[in-house]
């Protein structure tokens, strides 16, 4: 989102911002985008990337992100012949990112990478631009990333994940919160400061919520571990 603000303020050409509507995108993320677009005067296009109709994506393989981004960039290309810019930053290159291969296929440019800008610098830029509500937002990968590799992506799983994470965000506010759907069941991962605040009352609320979605096993709680639903070595 910071890139969108920079583009709007500095480029002397028409710029259109694209945001994907999807069960894998939390509702609050879409609401945040719409709020910023209205306040900043962006030209915003809300699009359906149709990844939920792609069986390759739904099978949740190790390179699921490739199919997600391929669908997204293909859809954006239907709206414009202009260059597509992504908010990918320098730190993203140190991780396994199959979506970057899709970006190559569509000749997507990554201005932050080209300028050697990482996450810390982006937060400083956001602060300098007065973007107080996003400068400290924790990383928020799509909800499908919470589903263990090889388990199919479904609307029901995504709704469960979104509902649980919204409940926990209402309880804790900002912080790293992940609801993982794994073969062993539901695992809630929290940063240590939040994990220490989980009490019996909150556990009961979460248990009641996941039962609505047909999960009757107990919910596990553990410290946050980046990418713990990703099983690259098994597939």
Explain the meaning of each model-derived region.
Residues 175, 180-188, 223-227:
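Small/polar glycine-rich anion-binding or flexible loop at a beta-alpha turn
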Residues 113-117, 123-178, 221-223:
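Mid-to-C-terminal catalytic subdomains of enzymes
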Residues 183, 187-201:
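A short interface-forming secondary-structure element
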Residues 164, 199-210:
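Short amphipathic alpha-helices in soluble, non-transmembrane regions
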Residues 52-53, 148-150, 193-195:
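A short, flexible beta-alpha/helix-coil linker loop
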Residues 1-128, 186, 205-216, 225-227, ...:
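ATP-dependent adenylation/nucleotidyltransferase module used to activate substrates
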Residues 68, 72, 156, 160, ...:
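Soluble or luminal CAZymes and related metallo-dependent hydrolases
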Residues 60, 64, 153-156, 197-202:
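Alpha-helix N-cap and loop-to-helix initiation/capping positions
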């Amino acid at each position: 989102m910071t890139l969108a603000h920079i583009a709007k303020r500095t480029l002397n050409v028409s710029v259109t911002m694209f945001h994907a509507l999807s069960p894998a995108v939390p509702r609050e993320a879409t609401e945040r985008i719409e709020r910023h677009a209205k306040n900043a005067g962006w030209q915003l296009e809300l699009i359906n990337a149709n990844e939920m109709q792609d069986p390759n994506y739904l099978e949740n393989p190790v390179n699921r992100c490739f199919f997600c981004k391929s669908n997204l960039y293909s859809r954006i290309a239907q709206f414009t012949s202009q260059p597509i810019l992504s908010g990918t930053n320098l730190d993203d290159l140190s991780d396994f990112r199959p979506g970057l291969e899709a970006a190559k296929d569509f000749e997507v440019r990554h201005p932050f990478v080209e300028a050697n800008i990482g996450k810390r610098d982006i937060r400083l830029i956001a602060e300098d631009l007065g973007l107080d509500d996003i400068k400290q937002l924790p990383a928020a990968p799509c909800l499908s990333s919470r589903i263990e590799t090889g388990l199919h992506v479904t609307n029901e799983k995504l709704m469960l994940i979104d509902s649980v994470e919204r409940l926990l965000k209402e309880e804790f506010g900002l912080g790293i919160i992940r609801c993982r759907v794994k073969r062993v069941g539901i695992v809630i991962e929290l940063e240590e400061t939040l994990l220490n605040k989980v009490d019996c009352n909150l556990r009961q609320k979460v248990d009641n919520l996941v039962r609505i979605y047909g999960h009757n096993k107990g919910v596990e709680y553990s410290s946050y571990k980046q990418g713990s639903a990703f099983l690259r070595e098994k597939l």
